[in-house]
């Protein structure tokens, strides 16, 4: 045991340093703690959702649990395990992106599970937890090593987060580097999944319907959103993937009375190049526009 003591102390020191870095989770956890009794809306999804909704521009108290690489499995665990802390929760907003149903769920050892266990006491490991499950650095050493370097040494890529944990200075990115030049952007490659995954689709759609059933059984209004994408992304989509996704969503809407669809994926009129960080993520300016529009929709 004495042999391991210095190692444990070292990891604790590193994790303490990690916790000093501004992160959205810290602010979200604090907001959940202080405003849980009054939160009426909660958002769930991937980085696209994280970027798109800034609760500052919603009329009701809200929290956005969207996070990079987050799939519906983790979304559902978060909802189930925090619901009792939100006695006035009325609306849940779930992202279903273009290829959400084609991508396998994250494993029970997904590194973000440590994040949610650490900050929100949400156990998504599907097992008994241990001390190490709260240690952020060892959950993803490459990610946190870069974060430590950026914060303590190079002083770059430091996020500024509002009370709700939204990154308000998220304006840089691919399009910024290209100076929002649409001709240059059009010549760039696009990160997009075009491969259909029949097995994942079958599992994911059944699992997602379980989420919808849960919201219905718990008297929650559910809004499914497809988020704005830039034109270069839209033209690269696999039509079969889009059709399958949209067919499932329409079927669910017709089946469950508590469900509404807010589809803005193809809205190229309201959103232009200046609203995007890259072809599939809004920047903080685009998020303000989108959240205000969503607010109007939710108010009707």
PLM feature segments, named:
Residues 212-238:
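Active-site segments of SGNH/GDSL-like serine hydrolases
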Residues 40-42, 91, 221-223:
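Structural motif
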């Amino acid at each position: 045991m004495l042999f391991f003591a210095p190692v444990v102390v070292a990891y604790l020191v590193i994790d303490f340093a990690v916790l000093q870095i501004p992160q959205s989770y810290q602010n979200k956890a604090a907001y959940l703690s202080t405003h849980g009794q009054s939160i009426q809306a909660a958002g769930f999804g991937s980085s696209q959702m994280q970027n798109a909704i800034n609760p500052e521009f919603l009329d009701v108290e809200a929290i956005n649990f969207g996070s990079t690489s987050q799939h519906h499995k983790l979304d559902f665990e978060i909802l189930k395990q925090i619901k009792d802390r939100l006695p006035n929760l009325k609306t849940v907003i779930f992202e279903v992106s273009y290829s959400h149903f084609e991508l396998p769920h994250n494993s029970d050892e997904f590194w973000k599970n440590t994040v949610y266990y650490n900050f929100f006491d949400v156990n998504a490991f599907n097992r008994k937890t241990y001390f190490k499950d709260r240690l952020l650095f060892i959950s993803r050493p490459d990610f946190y090593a870069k974060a430590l370097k950026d914060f303590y040494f190079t002083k770059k890529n430091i996020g500024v987060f509002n009370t709700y944990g939204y990154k308000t200075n998220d304006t840089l990115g691919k399009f910024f580097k290209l100076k929002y030049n649409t001709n240059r952007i059009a010549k760039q490659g696009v990160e997009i999944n075009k491969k259909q995954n029949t097995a994942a689709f079958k599992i994911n759609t059944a699992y997602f319907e379980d989420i919808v059933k849960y919201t219905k059984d718990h008297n929650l209004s559910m809004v499914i959103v497809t988020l704005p994408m830039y034109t270069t992304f839209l033209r690269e989509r696999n039509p079969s993937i889009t059709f399958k996704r949209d067919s499932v969503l329409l079927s669910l809407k017709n089946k469950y009375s508590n469900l509404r669809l807010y589809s803005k994926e193809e809205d190229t009129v309201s959103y232009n190049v200046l609203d995007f960080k890259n072809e599939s993520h809004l920047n903080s300016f685009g998020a303000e526009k989108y959240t205000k529009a969503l607010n109007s929709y939710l108010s009707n």
